Amino acid sequence: MSHHPDLSVSLDQLLLRKEVRVRQQGEWLKRHSLPLVSFTVNMPGAFKLNAASQTVMDAGMRAIQELCQKTGWRQVACQLLVEKTGPEAFVVIQAPSASMLKKAMMKIEREHPLGRLMDLDVIDVDGHIISRQGAQLPRRRCLLCERDAVICARSRRHSVEALLAKIEEMTHDYSCCA
């Protein structure tokens, strides 16, 4: 993966973007009074906006649309953002409950070929993020060794290069076979 140096992202830029995203989430919840899916891509390293992250975002948005068609849930509003910090989306979905919506998003994360690269947060109308633990689901597994992903990330068990090579392989395989 080659990268343009201007697209490198610092930790400060990531944290600032997260603050802005939280504010935007609040505005969306106020405007629609329905659960909100806040979709970001899990991409290690300093380059968050690349072909692989775009492939993951496109695949995730298709999966959400297919879910809505299959369940009869209505997608009320949607916004895609292409930020230097990576692609993002806000999707307001009229589902029976935020917890049912979270279970459906976790199913996408679990079963979609690129699901492990998707971060599909569900925020209820009161602004609370519904967590994996709250839904009694295990934490994410590492892409490379199947251990707890949080532990691998904190200990830097794998190099960014090894993780990016795996992501490149996953998105290539998906693009070829989808």
Swiss-Prot record:
Record-level GO BP terms: prosthetic group biosynthetic process
Sections of the chain in a coiled coil: none
InterPro entries for this protein: CitX
Pfam family, one: CitX
Reactions performed catalytically: apo-[citrate lyase ACP] + 2'-(5''-triphospho-alpha-D-ribosyl)-3'-dephospho-CoA = holo-[citrate lyase ACP] + diphosphate
Span of the signal peptide: none
KW Metal-binding (keyword) present: no
Domain of life according to the entry: Bacteria
Protein EC: 2.7.7.61
Entry keyword set: Nucleotidyltransferase, Transferase
GO molecular function: holo-citrate lyase synthase activity
Recorded family membership: Belongs to the CitX family.
Function: Transfers 2-(5''-triphosphoribosyl)-3'-dephosphocoenzyme-A on a serine residue to the apo-acyl carrier protein (gamma chain) of the citrate lyase to yield holo-acyl carrier protein.
Name the UniProt record assigns to this protein: Probable apo-citrate lyase phosphoribosyl-dephospho-CoA transferase
Gene source species: Vibrio cholerae serotype O1 (strain ATCC 39541 / Classical Ogawa 395 / O395)
Encoding gene, per UniProt annotation: citX
